[in-house]
């Protein structure tokens, strides 16, 4: 089934994004999306918000300008045992959790280490999406990760931001192709997200 949504976006709260929640919601409506998820960076990312921000997300309306809005976080995978930078208590409150590897939070490792880190994150019952697993700085064995994602009902992300010419991620296209081939082989589900950091990227 295909839904028109964007489940990985950032607001001013992330520290290096440029628009408010309401501005992002309005942009999603303009793009004729059915659903928007706001997933600001969790606490280990330099410059992002305090845990209190995520604790208070429950106070926000889940509909803006006629579009459904979910609130969650892009959490950081902090080590190759799958440790995340958000407590279980907070994870339980999130509508959606994207788990990703970022160089400010995790030094790139070997293919064995990275694969283990993703597998451990996939096993976390609060993780819904593995964010941009296409960065060659974090080499991954998709032959192991794709079946695991299917087994645990975790979505693998095709991240539009990775494919932009100015992306900081290394050699994403071959990894995306490999991931998609294996998702087709194993009938695993993917999700296409913008990773928007401003209104012009929403739904892209």
What are these regions (language model features)?
Residues 155-168:
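His/Asp/Glu-enriched short active-site or ligand-binding loop at hydrolase and phosphoryl-transfer sites
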Residues 41, 188-203:
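Short acidic/histidine-rich active-site segments
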Residues 15-19, 48-49, 139-147, 166-182, ...:
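Histidine/acidic-residue-rich catalytic or RNA/ligand-binding cores of hydrolases
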Residues 176-194:
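Conserved short secondary-structure transition element at the edge of the structured enzyme core
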Residues 29, 42, 47-158:
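Extended substrate/RNA-proximal surfaces in nucleic-acid metabolism proteins
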Residues 4-14, 38-41, 130-134, 194-196:
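Histidine-centered catalytic micro-motifs
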Residues 12-47:
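Metal-associated gating/positioning segment near the N- to mid-region
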Residues 34-35, 155, 189:
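Residue-level detector of anion-binding/catalytic polar loops
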């Amino acid at each position: 089934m295909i839904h028109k949504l964007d489940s990985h976006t950032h607001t001013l709260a992330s520290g290096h994004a440029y628009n408010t929640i309401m501005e992002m919601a309005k942009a999603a409506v303009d793009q004729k999306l059915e659903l928007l998820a706001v997933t600001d960076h969790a606490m280990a990312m330099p410059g992002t918000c305090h845990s209190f921000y995520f604790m208070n997300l429950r106070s926000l309306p889940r509909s803006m300008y006629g579009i459904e809005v979910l609130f969650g976080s892009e959490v950081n995978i902090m080590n190759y045992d799958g440790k995340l930078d958000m407590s279980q208590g907070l994870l339980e409150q999130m509508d959606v959790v994207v788990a990703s590897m970022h160089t400010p939070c995790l030094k790139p490792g070997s293919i064995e280490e990275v694969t283990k880190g993703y597998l451990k994150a996939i096993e976390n019952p609060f993780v819904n999406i593995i964010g941009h697993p296409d960065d060659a700085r974090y080499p991954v064995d998709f032959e192991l990760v794709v079946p695991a994602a299917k087994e645990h009902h975790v979505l693998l992300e095709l991240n539009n931001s990775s494919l932009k010419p100015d992306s900081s991620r290394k050699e994403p296209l071959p990894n995306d192709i490999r991931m998609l081939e294996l998702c087709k082989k194993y009938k695993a589900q993917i999700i296409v997200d913008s990773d928007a950091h401003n209104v012009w990227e929403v739904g892209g």
